Amino acid sequence: MSFVIAVPEALTMAASDLANIGSTINAANAAAALPTTGVVAAAADEVSAALAALFGSYAQSYHAFGAQLSAFHAQFVQSLTNGARSYVVAEATSAAPLQDLLGVVNAPAQALLGRPLIGNGANGADGTGAPGGPGGLLLGNGGNGGSGAPGQPGGAGGDAGLIGNGGTGGKGGDGLVGSGAAGGVGGRGGWLLGNGGTGGAGGAAGATLVGGTGGVGGATGLIGSGGFGGAGGAAAGVGTTGGVGGSGGVGGVFGNGGFGGAGGLGAAGGVGGTASYFGTGGGGGVGGDGAPGGDGGAGPLLIGNGGVGGLGGAGAAGGNGGAGGMLLGDGGAGGQGGPAVAGVLGGMPGAGGNGGNANWFGSGGAGGQGGTGLAGTNGVNPGSIANPNTGANGTDNSGNGNQTGGNGGPGPAGGVGEAGGVGGQGGLGESLDGNDGTGGKGGAGGTAGTDGGAGGAGGAGGIGETDGSAGGVATGGEGGDGATGGVDGGVGGAGGKGGQGHNTGVGDAFGGDGGIGGDGNGALGAAGGNGGTGGAGGNGGRGGMLIGNGGAGGAGGTGGTGGGGAAGFAGGVGGAGGEGLTDGAGTAEGGTGGLGGLGGVGGTGGMGGSGGVGGNGGAAGSLIGLGGGGGAGGVGGTGGIGGIGGAGGNGGAGGAGTTTGGGATIGGGGGTGGVGGAGGTGGTGGAGGTTGGSGGAGGLIGWAGAAGGTGAGGTGGQGGLGGQGGNGGNGGTGATGGQGGDFALGGNGGAGGAGGSPGGSSGIQGNMGPPGTQGADG
């Protein structure tokens, strides 16, 4: 016997669509009627006239048939529309009597037993912790439990009757000051068919205590799976712990155990539910950060496998696999260990869970893989402390004859982490009787301190001044050169500005050249931290006591990735050229801008971490079976990426040529930009895990498992990008811009990691870093 359903809304929509299609076809037929029925003869002869009449008769026959088809289509659409209306009326007419009939059937059972024959149980009110109502005795799901008031447990889910699912447990109340309350237990599934209800989530922790435990999943009857355990309550913040995940419910005679609930922060995952007679144990819940995963549920009394262990939280072990069925079944696999996370359990990864044991007949479960090692920290360049001290200024010299100002003194050296001091300014050179006046050279920047000190900036050049009456020339002093960055890395110092050349009479004036920018020092740029070692793999489970193979040991965890190298330090900016200034008819020429400093080399990437130790294989059954193979050592971590090379310093701007007396002016040339620094070398890939697990012992008939191999070496880190070349300095008025900085070299790829001995393969060499960007012309 087949069953047919009708949805009035769908029928109405279909009728509307068919009506639209019919309208479109009728419009097309009407448009084609005249051209097809009134075919004009091709010529005046009898044959052409006969052909035109023949084709015209075909068209007339088609349009006559089309008219009949259109009438049938309209009748069909009308019938479909009427049918939809009839279904709507029938539903409305029959709903009330059926509901009344169901009420008559349920009333005696409700009065006598407190539950209906057919129907779902009522949900418990939230905030009261009231349990969910039971489902109908014959058919119906249990109601959901109500959530608990603050600090009070959630209500239990209602039980199903013969057929139906248990209700979900209510959420536990949050703790105001104390602990969160437990979630409600899931309702029991149907006696014949149905799944157990999910346990309620635990309440969140109060200010100082722990979160509530998740509710246990509901059990079930003949056919069906146990309910999932509820999640543990959340932690309230620093110093508090979340709740443990609820255990999974027990499976039916034919059914699986429920999965355990996830643990809150710092709390274990729930244990998987046990299978009854035929089925698989439930999987363990995921552990919260710093806590292990839940163990898998045990297999049934007769035939079935154990549940898998839950994943470990950050830094914690995976759950152990559940034991196989008492008569026949394999042990469950161990859960994977949690990855290492900084600040959680010392930054160590979790070990893989052990595989579950078989009982009489069956193979042991495989051990879980170890967690991934902690990633290395990225290199960080030290900062530079400002230095308030400066070099001594040069002596001012003024008098008859050629006069030259004294040179500025060098800037004082910086202390640890301190920048070098600024060089002293050059002294004034002033000729009072029209001879040459030359400014003193600015002092060199002070030596940078170790551990990140920046190079000191060069001092400004002194002013050169004369009235030119004796044919003298005014020349500004050169700016001092910037100092190189510190030995342990530092930014190069800026070059000093060239001094002004000022001729108040008829002679020429030349601005001083800017100082050269100091080189950035990145040779000892900060290296990335080394990655951590991967976690150990879990041991394989024991094979069945009579017949069965041992479980394979879990692989060691992958080593952590090395940290990236820090960027190289930038080169110093070249000093600006000095101004040439005349008040008469002489030529005024600005000074040339200083060269930009070289960029520093990028830091080396950190070495990848070593792979973890493989787990041991499980022993075989006592009579017949093979021992489990040992787990392989973990794969080495990838080396860190090399740091980007430091940018070259920009060239200094050319000085301006300025006159107030009508003389010629020439702008100074802009300085050449500095070369960008080479990219850092990529980190070496981590060594593969050198220790594979031991093979398990064989049975009376069988042999031992093979020892685990060593892990592959990690991939070498990628070389850093070359630094960008410095921009050429802007030329002074009327001068050509400075030349752009050269391309920088890309960093070398990192060496591949050494494989474990023996059997580990070496890591792949890192890629060459691309060249830096050429600096723009001024």
UniProtKB/Swiss-Prot annotation:
Domain (PE): give its ranges: 1-92
Stretches with biased composition (Gly residues): 402-429, 436-510, 718-763
Where is region (Disordered) located?
125-163, 372-510, 718-778
InterPro entries registered for this protein in UniProt: PE-PGRS_N, PGRS_rpt
Report the SS bond pairs. none
Q: What protein family does this chain belong to?
A: Belongs to the mycobacterial PE family. PGRS subfamily.
**What is this protein's record name?**
Uncharacterized PE-PGRS family protein PE_PGRS46
